[in-house]
């Protein structure tokens, strides 16, 4: 299926590009999330009429993400979790826990899907570098300090 991208999509293309994707990807992800439309003649005409508006919205989103990234860059998040005497956690710290901690710290715009844990969930006490992808072009490094609450 050919679609017109309504915003930048990682590993696919930029705003306004017409790309060919699998039908399921278009129907189940891109179109419901308003990231793309089917590439019909009517949709192309409507897109060209709204192109300036969509580019302005994209620029505003990018500026907001860069502003948040400037505040978030180098931030150190402390998470306390129950742990055994050897430093292993009972359970783990997931991207949802990190996103919740960042929201409590005043970064409300961070969603769990934006948090990237390079080695999977954190299962031991220590400091871990993680990345937060605020926008397709804005990725920020954050340090998560996991402290153990001896059970």
From Swiss-Prot:
Q: Does the keyword rRNA-binding apply?
A: yes
Query: Entry's InterPro entries?
Result: Ribosomal_bL9, Ribosomal_bL9/RNase_H1_N, Ribosomal_bL9_bac/chp, Ribosomal_bL9_C, Ribosomal_bL9_C_sf, Ribosomal_bL9_N, Ribosomal_bL9_N_sf
List, in alphabetical order, the GO biological process terms annotated in this UniProt record: translation
Which GO MF terms does the UniProt record name? rRNA binding; structural constituent of ribosome
Q: Which Gene3D superfamilies match?
A: Ribosomal protein L9, C-terminal domain (3.10.430.100), Ribosomal protein L9, N-terminal domain (3.40.5.10)
What are the entry keywords? Ribonucleoprotein, Ribosomal protein, RNA-binding, rRNA-binding
Could you name the Gene Ontology cellular component terms for this entry? ribonucleoprotein complex; ribosome
Task: Please verify whether the record's keywords include Phosphoprotein.
Answer: no
Q: Name one Pfam family in it.
A: Ribosomal_L9_N
Purpose of the protein = Binds to the 23S rRNA.
Q: What protein family is recorded?
A: Belongs to the bacterial ribosomal protein bL9 family.
The name this protein carries in UniProt is Large ribosomal subunit protein bL9
Which species?
Bordetella petrii (strain ATCC BAA-461 / DSM 12804 / CCUG 43448)
Q: What taxonomic lineage is listed for the species of origin?
A: Bacteria, Pseudomonadati, Pseudomonadota, Betaproteobacteria, Burkholderiales
